[in-house]
Amino acid sequence: MTDVERMVLRPNHEGEMCPVCGDRVSGYHYGLLTCESCKGFFKRTVQNKKQYQCSAEANCHVDRTCRKRCPSCRFQKCLTMGMKMEAVRADRMRGGRNKFGSFYKKDRAHRMQRNAMRVSTVQVPAVLGAQSQAQTFYQPPEHQVSSSTTDQNNQINYFDQTKIKTEYIKTEYDAHLQSPTLSSSTNQQLSVSDFIMRPGYLVDPQDSLAVLLGSTIDDPLLRHTFPAAYQLNEVKQEPFDYSEQFIHHSLHDYPTYTSNTTNYATMMPMTTVSSTQSLVTSTSSTTTGRMTEASSTSPILPLCPAPTEKTVDHFYNSSIAEMCKTLPDDAQIARIFTSVKGTSKPEKHAFSIQVAEENLKDIVIWAKNDQLFSKLSLDDQMILLQTSWTTVHIVDITNAMVHGNLLSQYKMSNGDEVPVGLVALLGNQTFVSSWNDVVIRLRNMGFTNFDYCAFRFLALFDQSMDSFPAVSTARSRVLQSWREVRCTTAFLEIFEQIRRLAYDSLRYLWNLHSNCPTNWEQFFPEASLVLEMIRTTVNRSASSSVTAITQVPAIQLPTPQATYTAVPYMAS
């Protein structure tokens, strides 16, 4: 393949510089023609939700030699130049979110047309015969240029006849190409058939070619049947969106369209558009006196305003990272164990209930500080806490075990050791092994602080209370934010298992209170907050249509890998 063929068959970005750092442009990335370095930097910043802070005055110079010194100013310059954060895929898969793919395919075709137009005379291969050897790509004859046409010699002389090379000449039209719209990060090559028009194509006075040239030229290249030797099968063709606005229909009522000379109106330079304005395409008239409406002109995308600090903050504030700020610190459960160690009786059941008592107080304070929870009525808040506190309690101790803040055995004041699983399950020895399996699975799956936050909020706004609009809204918000960092349902299956363990532990305490009152009075104080929660829940369940605790049969947990159905909670 000759140098001319390579120039014609692929987009030519040689000579263009990245508007962010000045490096060589590699293609369209997230709405802008940028280099590979700025593309990767922008993608990593958005996907990892990094927040930089400039150590100077937030006006650092960014170029190729110092672009890594201040990532804050570099990211702000990316946004200012027009790169779009919403074009980055959150699932970290290859490829961008291409909403204007047809526009950029047409743009690549225009760029390759301009490269072909700068070629003066190209010798066709000898296999085509001697008659076609003098054939030209683009050579406007003198009689086809009207009197209002600007001198074309400067454009033709840009092409070096000796080295068969050209330089990129930036025009006013390129301001539209740098519009901060979504684009694909891929840079596929086009074949000749993708940008060379078919024979008999009628040039519309408002065609994008007139915008590119800004002159009155009837281009013979558009009506030229390209040699078959240049139809290279190995060049992959990009699909083109042949929508109605890109199809030019023949207008038989106006024979001047097929004349040798067509006069175009002079293309005015594009003015600067503010962030509150939009680009309006004005109407123009042809030499025939017919007015062409704006809807028939070539599609021009509006200039989008650069993202402001408010919009950027809103993008990050909508994630689960904001919810994590309300979580207790990692050492809170360990501090509760230590404080209860010196005050409770040296007995396993008493120690377990006392830990739950102290943690329940913190859970109530945390829930009241949540915006959605605080908007509920006092009765609804009590119902939610009575339904969810055991699940939140188990989630807290499970998170401490996964991250190594607690050992599997905890030594009480008398020297005896109590399994942490027994404390998490409120003294229910039956399902300690199942809880240990949950801890191991979460540790192997990489249970993070984001997952802990989602578990805690999903436990608070339990799905059995979805009849409340506020609860349903809160659950949807948590799941949507959690989906930003997790794309698997395995964690939801484990969460359902924790809910089932919490339900069994709550029923175990009620059975202990009902069947063994002597042991209950020995282990637990009468003014216990945990006992008050259980009594209120049982009284509400007995007076409602929901199955009471004592009527539910024993639950045998299957293997940890099984999927659990919805838990029938006591409250409606």
Swiss-Prot record:
Signal peptide start and end residues: none
Assembly behavior: Interacts with lin-39. Interacts with nob-1.
DNA-binding region: 15-90
Protein role: Orphan nuclear receptor and probable transcription activator, required during development. Plays a role in male tail tip morphogenesis regulating the expression of the transcription factor dmd-3 in a negative feedback loop. Regulates vulval precursor cell (VPC) differentiation, in concert with homeobox protein lin-39. Involved in promoting embryogenesis, in concert with homeobox protein nob-1. May play a role in modulation of lifespan and immunity.
Species of provenance: Caenorhabditis elegans
GO CC annotation, single: nucleus
Localization in the cell: Nucleus
SMART domains xref list: HOLI, ZnF_C4
Family in the record: Belongs to the nuclear hormone receptor family.
CDD domains: NR_DBD_Lrh-1_like, NR_LBD_F2
Effect of L32F: In ku217; disrupts tail tip morphogenesis resulting in retention of the pointed larval tail tip in adult males (also known as the Lep phenotype)
Pfam families, sorted: Hormone_recep, zf-C4
Tissue and organ expression note: Expressed in the epidermis, the developing somatic gonad, and a subset of other epithelial cells.
Induction info: Transcription up-regulated in response to intestinal colonization by probiotic Lactobacillus fermentum strain JDFM216.
Identification of the protein by name: Nuclear hormone receptor family member nhr-25
Zinc finger (NR C4-type): 18-38, 54-78
InterPro entries: NHR-like_dom_sf, NR5-like, Nucl_hrmn_rcpt_lig-bd, Nuclear_hrmn_rcpt, Znf_hrmn_rcpt, Znf_NHR/GATA
